[in-house]
Swiss-Prot record:
Record protein name field: Transcription factor egl-46
C2H2-type Zn finger ranges: 180-200, 208-230, 248-271
Effect of substituting C200F: In n1126; defective hermaphrodite specific neurons (HSN)
One GO CC term, this protein: nucleus
Gene designation: egl-46
Organism of provenance: Caenorhabditis elegans
PANTHER family: INSULINOMA-ASSOCIATED 1, LD18634P
Source lineage: Eukaryota, Metazoa, Ecdysozoa, Nematoda, Chromadorea
């Protein structure tokens, strides 16, 4: 079956040839050209020779069916438009750390929760210093008794140098904490220097005593190094090691030496005399 558009083209081309276009180079006058154009047959039979073909019912039905099929195909193709094979993902700008990073993955809305290390409870008796612990408040004297002994500084207290220059610098600092009171023993002092110099009764150090000489050490490694000095004394019954009284003699020249090392050095140079060789044959013990 021929499409409708091709049908019209073939119908027009199959018609009679049109009138020739008058040439501008011809010597014939314009009146003669006009007479020739008037003589052209303009009947419908000449212009539309295939017009009776449209009165064929079968041909008209086929043309209408073809037109309906084309309209349905256009509507169906409009609904199912071809999708591109690859579509670049669109990323919202609020999720981007930087505006130029458009091809990276967007950051998650809920950031991952960082794992927090579980710390021990910060109690009053927990000390951050290794080898040191804080006693309970009930294990020490009362605050009234400790306040009476506040002016009596211990000989083992920390040494703090107090000068006029240091006092002036302390006075320039605004007092935010209030009175100079120890947080542990609750004893009040006159100034920050005595507070820094006092020895708090609640602070105690780990003590490692030597079972042999009752010496006290603050570190177990120092105690282990100290106990090595007691091992030779313990092995020998508590007395220092004495020099050995064993005397070694040479079997060749019968000279005596205090140690085996000296005897070995001597035997490498010692030689027997002919008389000693003769006596060794007679007396095998020599």
């Amino acid at each position: 079956m021929v499409p409708m558009n091709d049908f019209w083209v073939k119908a027009i081309l199959s018609s009679t040839n049109p009138s020739p276009v008058p040439s501008t180079t011809s010597t014939v006058s314009n009146d003669e050209n006009l007479d020739k154009t008037l003589d052209f047959d303009c009947s419908t039979q000449t212009v539309f020779p295939t017009l009776p073909m449209f009165w064929n019912p079968t041909l008209v039905q086929q043309m209408l069916a073809l037109y309906q099929i084309q309209q349905q195909q256009i509507q169906f193709s409009a609904k199912l438009a071809p999708q591109p094979l690859f579509q670049e993902p669109t990323i919202q700008k609020e999720f981007l750390p930087f505006p130029h990073q458009s091809r990276k993955r967007p950051l998650p809305i809920d950031p991952k929760k960082t794992k927090l290390r579980k710390l021990n409870e910060d109690t009053v008796t927990s000390s951050p210093v290794s080898g040191m612990f804080i006693k309970e408040e009930a294990d020490v004297k009362s605050v009234e008794e400790l306040q009476k002994e506040a002016d009596l500084l211990d000989e083992t207290a920390a040494y703090v140098e107090v000068t006029e220059e240091s006092r002036q610098k302390i006075d320039e600092i605004p007092n935010v904490i209030g009175d100079c009171i120890c947080r542990l023993c609750k004893v009040k002092y006159e100034d920050v220097f005595k507070l820094a110099q006092h020895k708090c009764p609640r602070i105690a150090h780990e003590e490692y005593k030597c079972p042999d000489c009752d010496k006290v050490f603050s570190c177990p490694a120092n105690l282990a190094s100290h106990r090595r000095w007691h091992k030779p004394r313990n092995e020998l019954g508590g007395s220092p090691p004495a020099q050995s009284s064993t005397i070694v003699s040479c079997s060749t020249c019968f000279n005596s030496f205090p140690t085996k090392k000296m005897l070995k050095l001597h035997s490498s140079t010692c030689q027997r005399s002919p008389l000693q060789d003769l006596l060794s044959r007679v007396i095998p013990t020599m």
